[in-house]
Amino acid sequence: MSKAVLRFIRLSPTKARLIAREVQGMNAEEALAALEFMPNKAAKVISKVITSAVANGGYEPEEVVITSCRVDRGPYLKRFRPRARGRASRIMKPTSHVYVEVAQKKDS
């Protein structure tokens, strides 16, 4: 089993979790092929983390399964936007932590 972590990525955790749920339990090769055609920023980020997890274990993508793909909420970047009458509105820019674990397939 090998893992990869990407922390403090400027990505909404809510949007990233939608993609993470799709690939969990899939073969790594199939997951990377599916993520390649998804038009989301989260798909590109998660595919890089999966590739890293596979490389960390010294495996090939076709011989591993994604056992866990988790996205946690990171700290918010707080920004301010000027508004009328000298006021300001707070803009919250979310960050995420992406965790991926892969393990070798069990041949039955």
Curated annotation (Swiss-Prot):
Domain of life: Bacteria
InterPro entries registered for this protein in UniProt: Ribosomal_uL22 (IPR001063), Ribosomal_uL22_bac/chlpt-type (IPR005727), Ribosomal_uL22_bac/org-type (IPR047867), Ribosomal_uL22_CS (IPR018260), Ribosomal_uL22_sf (IPR036394)
Alphabetical list of Pfam families matching this protein: Ribosomal_L22 (PF00237)
Coiled coil: none
GO molecular function: rRNA binding; structural constituent of ribosome
Listed PROSITE patterns: RIBOSOMAL_L22 (PS00464)
Keywords of this entry: Ribonucleoprotein, Ribosomal protein, RNA-binding, rRNA-binding
Any one GO cellular component localisation term in the record: cytosolic large ribosomal subunit
Any one GO BP annotation for this protein: translation
CDD domains per UniProt: Ribosomal_L22
UniProt xrefs under NCBIfam families: rplV_bact
Assembly mode: Part of the 50S ribosomal subunit.
Family: Belongs to the universal ribosomal protein uL22 family.
Function in brief: This protein binds specifically to 23S rRNA; its binding is stimulated by other ribosomal proteins, e.g. L4, L17, and L20. It is important during the early stages of 50S assembly. It makes multiple contacts with different domains of the 23S rRNA in the assembled 50S subunit and ribosome.
This protein's name: Large ribosomal subunit protein uL22
Designated gene of the protein: rplV
